[in-house]
Amino acid sequence: MAYSYTEKKRIRKSFAELPTVMDIPYLLSIQVDSYEQFLQEHKKPKARENTGLQAAYSSIFPIESHSGNAELQFVEYYLGTPEFDERECILRGSTFAAPMRVKIRLIIKDKDSKDKDSKAAIKDIREQSVYMGEMPLMTANGTFIINGTERVIVSQLHRSPGVFFDHDKGKSHSSGKVLYNARIIPYRGSWLDFEFDAKDLVFARIDRRRKLLASIILRALGLSTSEILDLFFDKVRVYKGEEQFEIDLVADRLRGEMAQFDIVTPAGDVVVEQGKRINARRIRQLEEAGMTKISIPDEYLYERILAEDIIVNDEVIARANTLIDHELLVKLSAFEASESIKEFSILFTNDIDQGSYIADTLRADSTSSREEALIEIYKVMRPGEPPTVETAEKLFDSMFFNADRYDLSNVGRMKFNRRLGLDFVDTDDADIQRERSVLTNADIVNVLKELIEIRNGRGEVDDIDHLGNRRIRSVGEMAENQFRVGLVRVERAVKERLSSAESDNLSPQDLINSKPVAAAVKEFFGSSQLSQFMDQNNPLSEVTHKRRVSALGPGGLTRERAGFEVRDVHDTHYGRVCPIETPEGPNIGLINSLATFAKTNSFGFLETPYRRVVDGKVTDVIEYLSAIEEVGTVIAQADSPVTADGALSDEMVSVRSYGEFVRMPPEKVTHMDVSPSQVVSVAAGLIPFLEHDDANRALMGSNMQRQAVPTLRADKPLVGTGMERHVARDSGVCVIAKRGGVIEDVDASRVVVRVNEDEMIAGEAGIDIYNLVKYTRSNQNTCINQRIIVNQGDAIAVGDILADGPSTDLGELALGQNIRIAFMPWNGYNFEDSILLSEKVVKEDRFTTIHIQELTCVARDTKLGTEEITADIPNVGEAALSSLDEAGIVYIGAEVDAGDILVGKVTPKGETQLTPEEKLLRAIFGEKAADVKDTSLRVPTSSKGTVIDVQVFTRDGVEKDARARAIEKSQLDSYRKDLKEELRIFEEAARGRIGNLLDGQKVSGGSGLKAGTVMALADMKDMSLETLLDIQPVEEEISERLTQIAEYLVDKQKDIDVKFAEKKRKLTAGDDLQHGVQKIVKVYLAVKRRIQPGDKMAGRHGNKGVVSRIMPVEDMPYDENGNTVDIVLNPLGVPSRMNIGQVLETHLGMAAKGLGEKIDGMLKSQAAIKDLRDFLDKIYNQVGGEQVDLDSLSDDDIMALADNLRAGVPMGTAVFDGARESQVKDLLELAGMDRDGQQTLYDGRTGQKFDRKVTVGYMYMLKLNHLVDDKMHARSTGSYSLVTQQPLGGKAQFGGQRFGEMEVWALEAYGATYTLQEMLTVKSDDVEGRTRMYKNIVDGEQYMDPGMPESFNVLTKEIKSLGINIELKQSN
């Protein structure tokens, strides 16, 4: 295989034995693709599909006025370019969005013209482009910048629209009878439910309101009683015989029934005795006897139901749906032969599988006409309003049959038709989709029929947790819904104004007010439950956050209501949703993560890839199947043994079929998994030896990796899974080459690439410049910094990594550090998961992290005057102002401590009203200090650091201070320098290209050259660029290419001038600040945090703990070679937790390190390159796993590789396809260590040998974002609660420790009266006592004088508020 530039620098040894069938897809596609479909900004307006914005506009427009004489039509929309780029938006606290304009056509029709459709009827057409507000844009990494913060819109997993059949599991009724129900859920609109009650009547509910008989809905659809009976029942003809009634013999209807009378053949033989079950043999006997009719006794007809009206001589004897009784039969027999009834029909019902539910419901129904039914529905939906037939009809029609109010959506229609066994053809035609989006009479009847089938015992209820019944709603779809809501509001307002459009000569711009649209969009992105502040701890947490799938949110579940079933792992989750990664706590199971290979289809259902298997042979065809399509397939595991030609080799293969694991012959297999890791999510896929960890611990492991803080120097994991590279690449934190080429120039802040000839666009200079992000703050206050990993002259290809971001090392995710650990108890310092750490780790800065804090100072307009940012602060000593400049703002580079002033600010005080004389004196002598108070921005308590950046934003129209001007100048200078440098690089590249083009060419003149001169590179070295461009070569093609280059350079110069002018305009213009804000100063503090006792650390297997002590190196255990251990972990943390993966990781890590040391030894002793190759071949190709083609690497590559392997050979043990125990032992042996992976250790304090051998190795440890610095807190005096006057609580309020009820009991138990009194009075809420106490302490007196606690006053006031007078009597 070919290795990329970064991969060959450090090849990870893979233990995978299964072939790679498909690459891991782009991890952020669920976000990026969804929003791209919503905006369709790169498509021409005419080529846009009917989705996203296009669909929203099309569904609302055209808008017609009430009178019908004016109409607004939508033509097209287009997005402008955003005012600020992403970086500027974050700095300024603004939204990264593009202005959206819509071309709208206003058509005014002629009222008097009779013919509505003809062209003559149109009086006037006005077309105009209307501004519709700003539309937030997605950054390249799938995030949005809203008000200066990066946010992610989490996808929602909600119940798919369609029809669902369910039952109450026997919980609704005391008898425990199972009651079935059906529910039609539209995408938007009213829900329609049908349900049985305990008496087997069918009821309907609309929007979960009061229930109605289902027959009322059927009548409202315009069906009569007999039509309803025809739809739901088969009929049985009853004939009047000589002596008895007879019925037709229909074999299928009799099978399984109990005979209610003797069935006798014409010959008089009894075939079926009364009370015996009719089986197939007896039916055969009846058919053989040639019987077509059976005689029945009258009793058989009792309680049967008439299927039609019985009419004699125009008189209705009995209505349809009447129960037959003795009287009716007597009546029928009584008629004269001439007018008697020869035959009639009854409904075919029985107690086994043909219930008379609808007939019973009809009988219970008091309504008899459509009008009555509509009014009944109206009464339920609009109680208290007087119903009329017109309003009732309008309401019922708008609820289910009007496309503006009811939308089943394409997905809903697909699910609806599939569930009811009707055909569904997907189409892009908007009109057909709109037509199909409403219900029809047939739909409602079909749902009822299916419900009755299920009640009759034929058919299954649905499983609502099946992923075929839950779909994903991504960013684009949710944004579209919000946008449509805004447009509907606009539509209402426009309809009002449209009528007067002609008379007032209005244009589309006057008619449309885009505020509701802008507000709806802003509200969605700014404050929706699913628009979340991005978790930016490290690259993994970013990727995971974008791949998260939540069942919560608007239109979803709530934590309280969600039961156990919704949260549980379902068999359809396989390959779609990760069974491991989910939060602990109340959200468990409601928030999930997408599996590695999962993606959504056009309907929003999750799909997972499988290889197609035909006749027991595995093909290379990959099919994505949704949970719906997976039903009925037989899927083999990814590790099923396969022969060389792709045939499944086992006689019986372990497969999944209908959610069960079974064994089947290869011929029956239809599909096969593509990879063993397709079950898990990205975070779980980063855990090596995951298959050896208990699921609960794996869950913690995958969650804690997201909390790892990027360390100062990233260190790739020695034991990884091979997933690291994918996460780092797709997270967007690295700089990735867009085109291949050679590194032209490189420094700490940018990379310049000279692009390969074949990847260039004609006429361009072929230069790509990549600027790096340096020391910026992330959402979680960690540090984002990119570091170059390429050198000048390196050849790179598309997709190569040029610079590492935070937590990446040579293009691989590196969340923590490889640390030498030992599993042993050590003096109780690792009791209860504590971690004992060596001072060496602190000295080497292994777990040192940089945190950047943003502090903001705002100068506002107050009622008493304007706040001022200044260095002239009253009553503050010189020392406190030492690090401020003349504008009152701290210098960059200043080291500041808690309480130091960062920005000096004074606010006017308004206590005293000045007399005119005083005002005059003030004005003359400028004595200002008296009327202002100090409100400077200070470093918060428990913080200190270095100022690394200052930003000043000034309101438009307010004069900028010296500091703001200086910042502006330095930014412009640096930008100008960058642009000049950019131009220089382009010109250099152009020179190079011109030289190559002209080399060996004849010229016809120009630049003072004689015609016929042959150019040589050496001659052109000293020529200027202008001279070169003047040369006129003989060959026309060359001449054309020179002209192209010249034009390109002119364009580039123009482009650079425009860029500079634009930047200058942005910088010099005032900032758009909130109302009343004059100036904002942002100060960025960088803090270096070393690891210390109290910090939380963890491995990748859920093995977490808190640092208990940092020991001197000399006291730590050491081995025979004098190597000390860095961390001592408690061995008791392994057995009960069942995460054995950490032990295997430790052993494999030790082997990796040992091999690295061997390579280091070879390099130091300058071993021959052949020996190096042989040793590397042993490591990579002799101990199992994927083979590495070392022959394809040059000697220089081998040396570079060996140099990078000195610290250890990185291993990749993929999930479910990783290293086996024997392989780990072989590698330990190859590294020259004991196969058991244990060593003899000595006590650092005494030098004595420990009794037993100890497991020592290398584990990848993470430092989590739960730092003791952020949690430690102490208070002397501080703020008090307003009412109770008790100290506030919590670090944020600078609060105290609560001395609670139980602590009081403890003091009471020991009779510590004075301590108790002190706690309840002066240390808490006794205001006077506090003051006296303070005075006493200052005076050096040692006594306490407690008063009345304020909470006692509060209590007396509360009792008084109940109307009970309470007075305190003073005893002395």
From Swiss-Prot:
Q: Which GO terms describe its molecular function?
A: DNA binding; DNA-directed RNA polymerase activity; ribonucleoside binding
Tell me the enzyme class: transferase
Q: Which UniProt keywords apply?
A: DNA-directed RNA polymerase, Nucleotidyltransferase, Transcription, Transferase
Do the record's keywords include Transcription?
Answer: yes
* A GO biological process held by the record: DNA-templated transcription
A Pfam family matched by this chain, by name? RNA_pol_Rpb2_6
Q: Give the E.C. number(s).
A: 2.7.7.6
Q: Which reaction does it catalyse?
A: RNA(n) + a ribonucleoside 5'-triphosphate = RNA(n+1) + diphosphate
Q: Read off the InterPro entries from this record.
A: DNA-dir_RNA_pol_bsu_ext_1_sf, DNA-dir_RNA_pol_bsu_external_1, DNA-dir_RNA_pol_su2, DNA-dir_RNAP_su2_dom, DNA-dir_RNAP_su2_hyb_sf, RNA_pol_bsu_bac, RNA_pol_bsu_CS, RNA_pol_bsu_protrusion
Q: Which GO terms describe its cellular component?
A: DNA-directed RNA polymerase complex
* Stored HAMAP family: RNApol_bact_RpoB
Q: How does it assemble?
A: The RNAP catalytic core consists of 2 alpha, 1 beta, 1 beta' and 1 omega subunit. When a sigma factor is associated with the core the holoenzyme is formed, which can initiate transcription.
What is this protein's function?
A: DNA-dependent RNA polymerase catalyzes the transcription of DNA into RNA using the four ribonucleoside triphosphates as substrates.
The record's family statement is: Belongs to the RNA polymerase beta chain family.
Q: What is this protein called?
A: DNA-directed RNA polymerase subunit beta
Gene symbol?
rpoB
